[in-house]
Amino acid sequence: MTERVDPKKLIKGGLHDWEVVIGMEIHAQVTSRSKLFSGASTEFGGEPNDHVSLVDAAMPGMLPVINEECVAQAVRTGLGLKAQINLRSVFDRKNYFYPDLPQGYQISQYKDPIVGEGEVLVDLPEGESITVGIERLHLEQDAGKSLHDQDPTKSFVDLNRSGVALMEIVSRPDLRSSEEARAYVTKLRTILRYLGTCDGDMEKGSLRADVNVSVRRPGEPLGTRCEIKNVNSIRFIGQAIETEARRQIAILEDGGKIDQETRLYDPGKGETRSMRSKEEAHDYRYFPDPDLLPLEFDQAYVDALASGLPELPDAKKARFIKDFGLSAYDAGVLVAERASADYFEAVARGRDGKAAANWVINELFGRLNKEGRSIEDTPVSAEQLGTIVDLIGDGVISGKIAKDLFEIVWSEGGDPRAIVEARGMKQVTDTGAIEAAVDAIIAANPDKVEQAKAKPTLLGWFVGQTMKATGGKANPAAVNALLKDKLGIE
């Protein structure tokens, strides 16, 4: 691809400007009821070693059997990434020793992965976007978990996670800033959640990132990269990249060289520290797993899975812009979570799309964020919010009263129309009543009347006073028209 250098994204060192080059390896836990090669449960949060089969524990004579649902989920993900689906792939043994890896090797895919090259379109602030290349996606087993805080002199191993299916999604080194990296992971997580192939819960370890970072002077060859392992939040991904890039720049500007190694990010200390020298592929002694035949399926299998895919974020965003007249920004906010997009569509159906988006984004999302709640936990249903939008559009209530009504529905529930009737919240459309209020305000403020003729912006003050006098129930358009006429403002 053509190299791009964005001056805004260069990092200023003590001597030079530097470009950071980032590639990502995302480990996404496959959404399935059982593990990749055994029937043990993948449920999170069980007692230690409660979800372990003889295969997971690597007991002698136990053979792996592929879980077809995990294969289907990997293919769906590949299709969602616009990637090449390989009809033949091979499982390999990746040999290394860890206490929580009972086999002494991990079953993974090396030369022949299930998914080949693809791409992800990533939206950035200020209307920019970049395309990040996907190098490959392969299936592999997760390892268990070592526990070091249970006893002062012993470590324990929990194999509940051992053998759980992971998709390792490897990007090309197309990212050039921590902001781009965060946006990429956010978009990838959104796609996975839409597809239903990974829940993307980083707190539970369902999505983990290995971040490859190198720096170079603009236009120069790629520098030596360091891999930061198992970063478990999008915020920490950004911090780890910034910290590691600064570390490398300081070494290079001091005349040193970067050692290729695996590092760990410590958010408490705000630093990366060395874990081990970075392994190369030959260190793992990959070879095809003799217990597993090559994985083969036909194009009809892929086509059947493709026909069942949901509408993905990019397509949904384009449709929202086209069908509802939304801005790219508003459409992007609404499609960021599938549940949010579904909620908006339910509100907007048969209504003014822009008005619906305004209420969903500004009022509903604003309140949800304030209270730390998710869209799934909203006390205001799409039907209730749609009714509020209808009441405004039909002129039954004003925008100000609508906000009061929203608060009532949020706190107490109920049918918005019935609440408006019961509490006398309908806006005043009787021009006689509005005119009486306007006349009273004009009569009480002769000095303001004179000022308004010279300074038309004072109209807003008169509108505010009229709305106050009518308890916010006066029709704003009628108030504006009457005041302009009586004050002689064009």
UniProtKB/Swiss-Prot annotation:
InterPro entries: Asn/Gln-tRNA_amidoTrfase_suB/E, Asn/Gln-tRNA_Trfase_suB/E_cat, Asn/Gln_amidotransferase, Asn/Gln_tRNA_amidoTrase-B-like, GatB, GatB_C_1, GatB_Yqey_C_2, Gln-tRNA_amidoTrfase_suB_CS. Keywords: ATP-binding, Ligase, Nucleotide-binding, Protein biosynthesis. The keyword Membrane does not apply. Its EC number is 6.3.5.-. One of its GO terms (biological process) is translation. One of its GO terms (molecular function) is glutaminyl-tRNA synthase (glutamine-hydrolyzing) activity. It catalyses: L-glutamyl-tRNA(Gln) + L-glutamine + ATP + H2O = L-glutaminyl-tRNA(Gln) + L-glutamate + ADP + phosphate + H(+); L-aspartyl-tRNA(Asn) + L-glutamine + ATP + H2O = L-asparaginyl-tRNA(Asn) + L-glutamate + ADP + phosphate + 2 H(+). The keyword Protein biosynthesis applies. SMART domains: GatB_Yqey. It is an enzyme of class 6 (ligase). HAMAP family: GatB. Allows the formation of correctly charged Asn-tRNA(Asn) or Gln-tRNA(Gln) through the transamidation of misacylated Asp-tRNA(Asn) or Glu-tRNA(Gln) in organisms which lack either or both of asparaginyl-tRNA or glutaminyl-tRNA synthetases. The reaction takes place in the presence of glutamine and ATP through an activated phospho-Asp-tRNA(Asn) or phospho-Glu-tRNA(Gln). Heterotrimer of A, B and C subunits. PANTHER family: GLUTAMYL-TRNA GLN AMIDOTRANSFERASE SUBUNIT B MITOCHONDRIAL AND PROKARYOTIC PET112-RELATED (PTHR11659), GLUTAMYL-TRNA(GLN) AMIDOTRANSFERASE SUBUNIT B, MITOCHONDRIAL (PTHR11659:SF0). Belongs to the GatB/GatE family. GatB subfamily. This is Aspartyl/glutamyl-tRNA(Asn/Gln) amidotransferase subunit B.
